[in-house]
Amino acid sequence: MHKAPISTLILDSLFSNMMLAEMMNDDQLELLKHQQTGIQPVVPEGCNLYWSSLNVTGPETKPTNFVDRFRNNMPKRRVKEILHNVSGMAESGKLLAILGSSGAGKTTLMNVLTSRNLTNLDVQGSILIDGRRANKWKIREMSAFVQQHDMFVGTMTAREHLQFMARLRMGDQYYSDHERQLRVEQVLTQMGLKKCADTVIGIPNQLKGLSCGEKKRLSFASEILTCPKILFCDEPTSGLDAFMAGHVVQALRSLADNGMTVIITIHQPSSHVYSLFNNVCLMACGRVIYLGPGDQAVPLFEKCGYPCPAYYNPADHLIRTLAVIDSDRATSMKTISKIRQGFLSTDLGQSVLAIGNANKLRAASFVTGSDTSEKTKTFFNQDYNASFWTQFLALFWRSWLTVIRDPNLLSVRLLQILITAFITGIVFFQTPVTPATIISINGIMFNHIRNMNFMLQFPNVPVITAELPIVLRENANGVYRTSAYFLAKNIAELPQYIILPILYNTIVYWMSGLYPNFWNYCFASLVTILITNVAISISYAVATIFANTDVAMTILPIFVVPIMAFGGFFITFDAIPSYFKWLSSLSYFKYGYEALAINEWDSIKVIPECFNSSMTAFALDSCPKNGHQVLESIDFSASHKIFDISILFGMFIGIRIIAYVALLIRSYNNT
């Protein structure tokens, strides 16, 4: 990456038409001031992108249920052809639109060109940039991809999001903080986001924020910060009205006119939007039916016997003509074949074929010294614009903002902890140490573990699964390392998982009348912190392994409830059947409960009422005289205090490592 003056990154014309349409806001005045400076838009020259003989196959059906995935006698799934011998090109300084009906293959073609979402697909063929074969790392280095669905961390403002992206995508090696900040402000102005720059992006049904149109513009702003040579857009007008859609495509056309290579897929463009395309690629049944200037497609269809009716949207006519009707599939296939043959018989069609064949030969014979390094680049050694430390700091900042701003992450949890702690403290208020209250005191300690587990563990799962798609997308875009994200998020969230357990323990410990010693209180706080963090580690692991909120929330209690049952409160260790004792060894409830019980009962040397002369001989024999006898009655040993703490700490670290490995595997599969 070579440093260029920040002025060369200015795209003054981008979204200027959109701004002029918003006459009632102050952003137009900012844009006019910006234009009056006389700075001309300078965009890095784009690339000529070629794809040759692309063939893509994939499974026709997925396993119908969980059992079918593991049945030995499951019939082999049939394979279907998704793309067949697809060749084409996207020229520098041109806007290419890929059109077709549902199932035509346009989304698959976009995925192949961007090297994304290709799991379970067999892809054959080659992609070249300016005549040189390009792997997925080269494509991602030179391009940006605006995906159909906007994904953001909703607790950040528009400006903060762009500052975050600029810090990671522009890097700290080539640009100073001042240059990055200047670029962010320029893009905010160009995108018409000045008036909402300090508005939070928003979380659906939780936190009100930007509108759909503003989020779409923010998506564009995120991707063009570094002015990529190639811009891919998947359904850029999705969710926008016709007026705004026209201005979005006009903005893309402006980018192309200034030298960028722009490729989009689009669904049912209006006639105005269609007129903005330099070239169109019409697809049907996984084949390219036409590739060339948009204004030459309608005459070709007319020549083949399918004229466009008067006053009819040409894009609708082209797509409807190439649509496959299941009730009359033979006629549809005949129409598609006739138009394709008509296109191939033209000079334009022959030139497309010739370019495809030439690039196929070039790709087959392409060997250079520089290509060797590209072939060895993998997910684990790819290059990033920002250093690990810069990535960590930026991700920590974003995660911290999420913690303090998300209503479900702090305020609700704090209120929940306070209410539960005070209710527990009132129920067990100043419980005395007597033979009759031994079970109550043990219940206080087990409640410590159970309450902190269920109050924080289960609500944390949907928070992680909601953020996971954002992380996977940003990671696939090469914005940051998986390790930097995981470390930053864990450290940013750790303070609340220290403060909340201490707060709960402080209220319950002193209100319920547990052993009144400061060091015993500190040890109980330590155990509560460890139990909480083991529980959170499990939520991390389950969420990253299963990724789906419903599945994760179903699996979690299946694991946690049996572990809790063998925690030592409901059944003693000696009473557990031998074939279930291993569950007790895995129970973090058991280690936490034992540590708290030792902390309480080991300090109690005498239980006075057990020396009452009025008690019967049988009652005296069964009455524990001190805390050690209480521990023996529940199969706990006072010598296990440090051992229990060590096991809990080991579980905390070990399960976090499992969660990280699961996230790493998921990130790898998503690249």
From Swiss-Prot:
Ranges that cross the membrane: 409-429, 452-472, 498-518, 526-546, 551-571, 645-665
Residue ranges occupied by any ABC transporter domain in the UniProt entry: 64-310
Tissue: Expressed in the intestine in both larvae and adults. Expressed in the gut of males.
Main subcellular localisation: membrane
Membrane topology value: Multi-pass membrane protein
Residues exposed to the Extracellular side: 430-451, 519-525, 572-644
UniProt xrefs under CDD domains: ABCG_EPDR
A Pfam family annotated for this UniProt entry: ABC_tran
GO cellular component, one term: plasma membrane
Compartment annotation: Membrane
Matches recorded under SMART domains: AAA
Molecular-function GO terms, alphabetical: ABC-type transporter activity; ATP binding; ATP hydrolysis activity; ATPase-coupled transmembrane transporter activity
Cytoplasmic side: 1-408, 473-497, 547-550, 666-671
Binding site for ATP: 100-107
Function field: Required for efficient RNA interference (RNAi). Plays a role in germline development.
Family the UniProt entry places it in: Belongs to the ABC transporter superfamily. ABCG family. Eye pigment precursor importer (TC 3.A.1.204) subfamily.
Protein name: ABC transporter ATP-binding protein/permease wht-1
Protein's organism: Caenorhabditis elegans
